[in-house]
């Protein structure tokens, strides 16, 4: 079981400097642009730096404009995870770009042999010739562009090189493609200009398959953290396997009926939702026709009921979006339950007033309140810091001081 005890972030995105201790349930609030989402992303990357690829076009913005580098340190009960980010200098950027093009050349040299009668060349000669022609097209302007869109990630004492060189690579390969195919067509005796054109287009298309990539090797992956962006949960959940989906669907149906999330619900799956009218007659509604609030809570439950999240860390981005207050309340109870019973650690951002205040209602059981008094933190993000409140402090601020815990 993995549990975070503290998070320290320096120079990552909008966060200049932040150090917070964490509990089992962590509610992250604050105004826009104070770093709420950045905090969740920092935690995710500290466990799974390979996710840096997901930032693709925005790699250059991951390091705060006022910093030369970013550092994320996450303390857990079993050790420390550290991720450092820095921009490469011109020399390193050039080396990274050349290596990336070399890797690309190695991957397409067989395609060249398939398109042309080039048995007069050995595979090594062919690969070397193609590599030389592509690399000859690299200019200082290309390297400067690559430098702006690349990062060096230092993770657990090892360096990993990540670059988005899409525009520069396309220009280099486009300029080299015609030269390559004409040369080999000439030397192999091919006169088919259509093949030449198709090959050039195919060469560019093949390169587009992996526009943002790690050079040499990727950092190790981790399954300890799940990031759930609830803005996307109105989309139908992706199915995994028949057996796993059947169990998960049954669990969701049981939860919906037991907690009376939807009136008159009788059965649920991702294709149809069955209801029973007052007359006793049953009817079905296609899942796609259900409202966004219903789809959002289904999407969250689908993720939270996954066996892989049990006992691990779940990062929730704005639960409550699209949801009716009744859905929000039941979701909150469910989050408390999985944190309390399964040992799941929750870090969630929110602007939702109902979601926050429902943590302090009289509807909670005594056991739930005792749990929250020991394992709840409200992290109120500010421009360059965070105010962390315990359960009792947050409740006093809400009920006695009448403060807005959203930090607005």
Predicted regions and their residues:
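Switch/communication elements of ASCE P-loop NTPase nucleotide-binding domains
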Residues: 1-53, 277, 281-408
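Phosphate-coordinating catalytic segments in nucleotide- and nucleic-acid-processing enzymes
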Residues: 47-309, 377, 382-408
